[in-house]
From Swiss-Prot:
Ranges where the record places region Disordered: 50-75, 93-120, 141-194, 418-496
Biased composition (Polar residues): 175-190
Protein name per the record: SUN domain-containing protein 3
Record organism: Arabidopsis thaliana (Mouse-ear cress)
Gene label: SUN3
Alphabetical list of InterPro entries matching this protein: Galactose-bd-like_sf, Suco/Slp1-like, SUN_dom
Quaternary assembly: Forms homomers and heteromers with SUN4. Interacts with SUN1, SUN2, SUN5, TIK and WIP1.
Record's keyword terms, sorted: Coiled coil, Endoplasmic reticulum, Membrane, Nucleus, Transmembrane, Transmembrane helix
Subcellular location: Nucleus membrane; Endoplasmic reticulum membrane
Compositionally biased region (Basic and acidic residues): 141-157, 421-433, 445-459
Cited PANTHER family: MEMBRANE PROTEIN CH1 RELATED, SUN DOMAIN-CONTAINING OSSIFICATION FACTOR
Gene3D superfamilies attached to this UniProt entry: Galactose-binding domain-like
GO cellular component term, pick one: nuclear envelope
Length: 660
């Protein structure tokens, strides 16, 4: 019995010691686990807890760009607080997760650009307002324009209010974008409305200009045929005369000798002579006669070789002829021709530079512009070959006689026929003035007054026709002596009686033309008097139109002042809106910072919960193992097994709660 009791006591003591050792080991393990949990919590709390991606991944939050969030944006006029901002924390977190430094910098740059755009739009809008007001249609009463500009600020305020209401229900990033779009849109709307208004005003101006042109055409409707001025008439006659003279010059008919040869004005037999030459020249007078054995001789090395020839008469020089027949000499190459009407003189008229060929026969040179001269000067510039002497055998000059040319200038049948040729459609008008002129020469004063009344009724073109007809008539009267002159001997002078007869007839024609010009001036005076009366009447009408335009401009100026004041009010309103926008952006930045702190706190709590869950899971596993071992050995007591069961239940409950 004693042995069994001792055995039992020993067994119980061993069990108690084993139980104590087990509890000690268990307590040491629990203490070690709690120490490990504490250090792991500290390490996790000081780790990479500021990242946003783990929070999104762990909490299963959606990307703010994918869906349409339901959070609300507090209006500018309403107070902003953390309580109102934390109504929906999940949406706020999802809204701020994608905000980073690069996006903030981009937003600031965009805001700066938009602010500059808005300021530029303000200036443009102000300038366009002034343009608009200055280009308002003058036909409008001004009421529509005033109501339009009065409604413009109201419409802008309504649009801006609608913009703020529409932006409620968007996230902060969308809010920024929408505000930027609103700013840009406001400027674009202003510019588009201004452009439309300018286009409309330009169309109105075009219509107004067309109307003004129509009115002017209506005012100018009574057509008035302005007659040609006297200067224009004289210039027309002189131009036709000059044209005929130029035609004659281009086709100059040289004066002919009785034998049919051309008249040489540089012939010694006609009275021409050599006046001077360079001192080295020998035989200068030989060039005025046709003797092949005589010539003008100059050493080729001499500088400034020249010869001055006096023509037999003053003439219109058109052609000169030179020749060198000496074989053993150098031919003339380049020479200059000068002329004058008086000698001696210091100023010679340049008539042309010519280049001769290296030949031993006569060469003709025609002047581009024939000149009236009496004295010719030939300057020898260069020569051909390398002979010692440069020779010239012959020089001849051809042209028109001065007296004959003067008579042709005074009275030319061809010129009169060409200058006063009737125009198409005016033959009927010109026949009547010719008859009137003939009747004026033979009728008395009463007939003259009757004809003058008829002439006043006729248009001024008839007066021009009368003048032309009278001059044509006078030219017909003067044609007979000219024909006599033309049929006279070709090389002889006309008698003095013929010249006097021609001059007297010319004076008669001038007297007749003077009377016609006097009547022409009377007609011009009458016509221009009527024109001035019409111009005075038109000036009165235009003065009334100018007064009306001045009144319109005064009304436009008043409307412009009103529009400028409205533009200033709009500018102030924009400044207030910009200030509110800046305030809202600052409050948004504060909310974003607070939400970042909340997100960090939540992430830290999440990691703590994860740690606690891990520890509880470990304790639960240990408790399960202990219970299984106790049940397997059958040595566990109820108190010990109950403690492990309690630990298992508590760990399971904590894990269940954390998993929810």
């Amino acid at each position: 019995m004693q042995r069994s009791c001792r055995t039992r006591r020993r067994v119980s003591v061993n069990k108690f010691n084993g139980r104590n050792s087990f509890y000690k080991v268990s307590l040491s393990l629990v203490f070690l686990l709690w120490v490990l949990l504490f250090f792991s919590t500290l390490l996790i709390s000081h780790g990479d807890g500021a990242k946003d991606e783990p929070l999104n991944d762990s909490m299963g939050m959606a990307d703010p760009d994918d869906g349409q969030s339901d959070e609300k944006v507090v209006p500018f006029d309403g107070p902003l607080s953390l309580a109102s901002a934390s109504v929906d924390v999940t949406s706020d977190l999802s809204r701020n997760d994608d905000v980073n430094l690069s996006e903030e910098s981009e937003d600031k740059e965009q805001e700066a650009e938009i602010s500059s755009t808005v300021s530029g739009n303000d200036i443009e809008s102000k300038d366009t307002y002034l343009l608009k007001q200055s280009e308002i249609n003058k036909k409008d009463t001004g009421i529509d324009a005033g109501s339009k500009y009065d409604d413009f600020p109201k419409k802008s305020e309504i649009n801006n209010t609608g913009t703020w209401n529409d932006t409620e229900g968007k996230d902060d990033n969308n809010f920024l974008k929408q505000s930027q779009l609103n700013k840009t849109g406001t400027g674009n709307d202003t510019e588009s409305s201004d452009n439309e208004f300018l286009e409309q005003n330009q169309m109105n101006k075009t219509v107004l200009g067309n109307g003004t042109e129509i009115n002017v055409s209506k005012v100018d409707q009574p057509s008035r045929a302005v007659p040609l001025g006297l200067d224009e008439f004289k210039s027309r006659a002189s131009n036709s005369r000059n044209k005929s003279l130029s035609d004659q010059v281009s086709g100059v008919i040289h004066r002919m000798e009785p034998g049919g040869k051309e008249y040489n004005y540089a012939s010694a037999s006609k009275g021409a002579k050599v006046l001077s030459s360079n001192k080295e020249a020998k035989g200068a007078a030989s060039i005025l006669s046709r003797d092949n054995d005589k010539y003008l001789r100059n050493p080729c090395s001499t500088e400034g070789k020249f010869v001055v020839v006096e023509l037999s008469e003053e003439t219109l020089v058109n052609t000169i002829k030179i020749a060198n027949f000496e074989h053993y000499s150098s031919n003339l190459k380049e020479f200059e021709l000068q002329g004058t009407l008086v000698y001696p003189t210091d100023t010679w008229v340049h008539m042309g530079n010519f280049t001769a060929s290296n030949v031993k026969h006569e060469q003709n040179f025609t002047l581009l512009e024939p000149k009236w001269v009496r004295y010719l000067k030939l300057n020898f510039i260069s020569h051909y070959g390398s002979e010692f002497y440069c020779t010239l055998s012959l020089i001849e000059v051809y042209g028109v006689d001065a007296v004959e040319r003067m008579l042709e200038d005074l009275i030319s049948v061809q010129d009169n026929k060409n200058a006063y040729k009737p125009r198409e459609g005016d033959s009927e008008h010109k026949e009547k003035p010719m008859q009137q002129i003939e009747s004026l020469e033979g009728d008395d004063g009463a007939d003259k007054s009757t004809h003058r009344e008829k002439e006043k009724e006729a248009p001024p073109e008839n007066m021009l026709a009368k003048t032309e007809a009278s001059m044509a008539k006078s030219s017909n009267k003067l044609s007979e002596p000219v024909e006599e002159m033309r049929h006279h001997q070709p090389g002889s002078r006309m008698p003095g009686d013929t010249v006097l007869k021609i001059l007297m007839q010319k004076l008669r024609s001038l007297d007749l033309n003077l009377s016609i010009l006097e009547r022409y001036l009377e007609e011009l005076n009458l016509r221009y008097g009527n024109i001035f009366k019409e111009m005075d009447r038109e000036a009165g009408v235009r003065e009334k139109a100018i007064v009306a335009l001045r009144l319109d401009l005064e009304g436009m100026k008043e409307r412009q002042e009103g529009m400028v004041s409205e533009a200033e009010e709009m500018k102030e309103w924009r400044k207030r809106v910009e200030a509110e926008m800046e305030k809202a952006e600052k409050e948004k930045e504060n909310i974003r910072q607070s939400l970042e702190q909340v997100s960090k706190r939540l992430e830290w709590m999440e990691k703590k919960c994860l740690t606690v869950f891990t520890v509880c899971l470990g304790f639960g596993i240990i408790a399960v193992i202990a219970v299984v071992i106790g049940m397997g050995t059958g040595l566990a007591e109820k108190t010990g097994s109950g403690a492990w069961l309690l630990l298992l239940i508590s760990s399971t409950f904590i894990m269940f709660v954390l998993s929810l």
